[in-house]
Structures are given as structure tokens and as C-alpha cells.
Swiss-Prot record:
Protein name (database record): DNA replication and repair protein RecF
Keyword Cell cycle belongs to the record: no
HAMAP family cross-referenced by the UniProt entry: RecF
Principal location: cytoplasm
GO cellular component terms given for this protein: cytoplasm
Subcellular location: Cytoplasm
Swiss-Prot/TrEMBL GO biological process terms: DNA replication; DNA synthesis involved in DNA repair; double-strand break repair; SOS response
Signal sequence, start to end: none
Positions that bind ATP: G30, E31, N32, G33, Q34, G35, K36, T37
Keywords of the record: ATP-binding, Cytoplasm, DNA damage, DNA repair, DNA replication, DNA-binding, Nucleotide-binding, SOS response
Family affiliation: Belongs to the RecF family.
Role of this protein: The RecF protein is involved in DNA metabolism; it is required for DNA replication and normal SOS inducibility. RecF binds preferentially to single-stranded, linear DNA. It also seems to bind ATP.
């Protein structure tokens, strides 16, 4: 699916933007703080209904405005569709071809064909940072793979909050009543994540070997569940094992007022040659591993959907060494995907630019076309 046109109104620092992107590569150039990332976030928000950066929704609205809006025309096998989302302090409202979700349009229909993968400098810290970032990566990748994950994750968060409240204030029978919904929703997420990791692992190995060469250690990817929950089973068995872990930790959880086992406590383990990359990998190896992980996600979606996702790359070239940047740009040039890239330096992108690459300047929230 291709983004034919993008309209942004009062989103972050973008007052009014009308963009006709290239079907292949659209490059946004400008100094830091001018709005390049905000434009990528507008596209990401349109295709996922979630902010790219964790904030309150009200912070997405331009200062002084009552609400922000993003709309796009997407061309796919079924023709052209218009998706739009308005955001204000009270929440967001999404529409598909003018019909609001829930009253004429379904969430599944909205997300059909809208998979997007974002790659930012923060992602390069994925290996060495804490598990929160790796869980966010897993959930975003799982959502792209199975859009129903969005609702499943929300169900789990609601159940988790309810059980935590019961642990802190409720009697035993109240906690027990909230445990079953948590187990059901948690097992569903655990199985989704397990299946995703199984799909990504061989693609990660192949991409890392291609990036780093034949002498590099073999890359591995594994899912580590908290509380000793073994997720290598059918969903019903995973649910039983999660329930057992929660029962075994009940007194400890009561003391802390917090659920200590479940998807919200798990981690994604990246290793090189059998050793944890977080502790034993060099910075260069860690960055190559993250690059390989992103390529694995793209290739996995390409295989599942029959087409590559929409790509959003936020100033990544400036954070990679020349060899890895050449590899990334070469990969993008060969991929039949629509990509949006930001940079402060045109020279980092230009070697891979094709005749259909479109360049734009972003300055103080204003987006203007540049002559090639």
C-alpha cells in the first residue's frame, strides 16, 4: 500500500502540511528541532493510532490549537482509501473513508494494509537499554504482524491494573476474581510474542551475518518469560503455567502491591555466539544487531503481507558508521518499499537516491519541496 497524499493540521509544530510523497523515497532535510521527526510521527500516528514517542495525547496538538489532525490517501489492491485521525486532550477519533470507527467502520478495516516500521536513533540503544524498550519493540512488531494485538494488549493492561489494585486493597476473593482475566489475556500475548520471535530469529541471523561478515559470531534471539513461565506450549497450557506462577508469587505480590509475572515483566534476549550482546557485545556489534533486527522485522512483514511495510527512518544514517550506512541505504534502494527518511545532511542520503527520490526541506514546521 502506498501513501499518495498526506495532510497534517496542528500536529506538534506542524500548522498545516500538504505533502505528495514519492512512491519510493521521500527525504526530509533540515536542522534539528524543525519538525522532521514530527512529520514522521504524524505518519506513524495515522498508521498505528499510537504516538511514536510516549506522551499524553494532548501533547500532540500544536500549542494554542484545540485539536490536531492527520489524514492520508492510501492506494492498495482494493483501490484508494482515506484514513484520518483527530486528536485532542480528550482522546482521538479515527475515520475510514469518512466513517468513524465503531459507527460504520471497523478497526480491522482501518488497519488493513497500514503496516509501518519506524527506525530511530533510540532504537540503536535497544540492546544495551533496559527491557522496557525491548518489550515495546515486540509489541509494535506484533501489532504490525497481527493488528488484533492492539485490542489484546489493551485487554491485558486493563486486567493488570485491576489485579494490582486488588492486590493493594482487596480481600483474597477479589484478587482471585481478577486473576482469571489477567491469565487469559496474558497467555494470548505470550503466544503472540513467542510466535513473532520464532519468525524473526532466522531472519535476524541471516541479516546479521550479511551485515557483519562470515567471521562474525552467530546472532540469536529468544524470549525470556518472568516467573519461569515456559511459553513453548499451546495457549491453554501457557495460561495454566502463568496461573501457577501468579499463585506461587501471590504473597510476594501482595506485599509489593504489584504483579511480578506476566508479559509486562518479560524480556527479549539478543545474543552473539551464545553470550548476551548487552554485556559482551561491542557498540559496533550491538548496532549491527539492531539493524539486523529491524531488517528481520521488515522482511517478516514482507513475507506475511506479500509486500514490504511503509518505512520511517529518523536520522539513522548519522548514527551509523559508514559501512553500516552503506549497507542500510543499499538495502533500502533494492527494497520495493515506500520510505520516508529524515536527515540533517543531504550527503548521507544522496548516494542511494534514485530518479524518483523526492527531497523536502523542513523549517519551523513548514515543509517545502527542494529541487534535486
Amino acid at each position: 500500500m502506498k501513501l499518495l497524499s498526506l495532510h497534517v493540521q496542528d500536529f506538534r509544530n506542524l500548522a498545516a502540511v500538504a505533502l505528495a510523497p514519492s512512491p519510493r523515497a521521500t527525504v526530509l532535510l533540515g536542522e534539528n528541532g524543525q519538525g522532521k521527526t514530527n512529520l514522521l510521527e504524524a505518519i506513524y500516528f495515522l498508521t498505528t493510532l499510537k504516538p511514536l514517542r510516549a506522551v499524553r495525547l494532548a501533547e500532540l496538538v500544536r500549542f494554542g490549537a484545540d485539536q490536531g489532525a492527520v489524514a492520508g490517501d492510501f492506494e492498495g489492491p482494493g483501490g484508494v482509501r482515506r484514513v484520518a485521525v483527530q486528536v485532542a486532550a480528550g482522546g482521538r477519533t479515527a475515520t475510514l473513508d469518512g466513517k468513524a470507527l465503531g459507527s460504520g467502520a471497523r478497526l480491522d478495516d482501518y488497519f488493513e494494509g497500514l503496516a509501518s516500521v519506524c527506525f530511530s536513533p533510540d532504537d540503536l540503544l535497544l540492546v544495551k537499554a533496559g527491557p522496557d524498550g525491548r518489550r515495546r519493540f515486540l509489541d509494535r512488531a506484533a501489532f504490525n504482524r497481527w493488528p488484533a494485538v492492539l485490542g489484546e494488549a489493551r485487554e491485558y493492561v486493563r486486567a493488570l491494573r485491576a489485579r494490582n489494585a486488588a492486590l493493594r486493597a482487596g480481600p483474597a476473593e477479589v484478587e482471585a476474581s481478577f486473576r482469571e482475566p489477567l491469565v487469559r489475556a496474558g497467555a494470548r500475548l505470550l503466544v503472540r510474542r513467542r510466535e513473532l520471535v520464532a519468525e524473526l530469529a532466522p531472519r535476524l541471523q541471516a541479516a546479521f551475518a550479511e551485515i557483519s561478515g562470515p567471521e562474525a559470531p552467530e546472532a540469536h534471539l529468544a524470549y525470556r518469560a518472568a516467573g519461569g513461565v515456559d511459553v513453548a506450549h499451546p495457549e491453554a497450557e501457557v495460561a495454566a503455567r502463568l496461573a501457577h506462577a501468579l499463585e506461587a508469587r501471590l504473597e510476594r505480590d501482595r506485599e509489593k502491591g504489584f504483579t511480578s509475572a506476566g508479559p509486562h515483566m518479560d524480556d527479549l534476549v539478543l545474543a552473539l555466539g551464545g553470550k548476551g550482546a548487552r554485556l559482551y557485545g561491542s557498540q559496533g556489534q550491538q548496532r549491527a544487531l539492531v539493524l539486523a533486527l529491524k531488517i528481520a522485522e521488515i522482511e517478516n512483514l514482507r513475507a506475511a503481507l506479500g509486500r514490504p511495510p511503509l518505512l520511517l527512518l529518523d536520522d539513522v544514517s548519522s548514527e551509523l558508521d559508514p559501512a553500516k550506512n552503506r549497507f542500510l541505504l543499499g538495502y533500502l534502494a533494492a527494497l520495493p518499499a515506500q520510505a520516508f527518511l529524515t536527515s540533517t545532511d543531504r550527503r548521507l542520503i544522496e548516494p542511494a537516491a534514485g530518479p524518483d527520490t523526492a527531497f523536502f526541506e523542513v523549517r519551523s514546521g513548514v515543509v517545502s519541496p527542494l529541487v534535486s
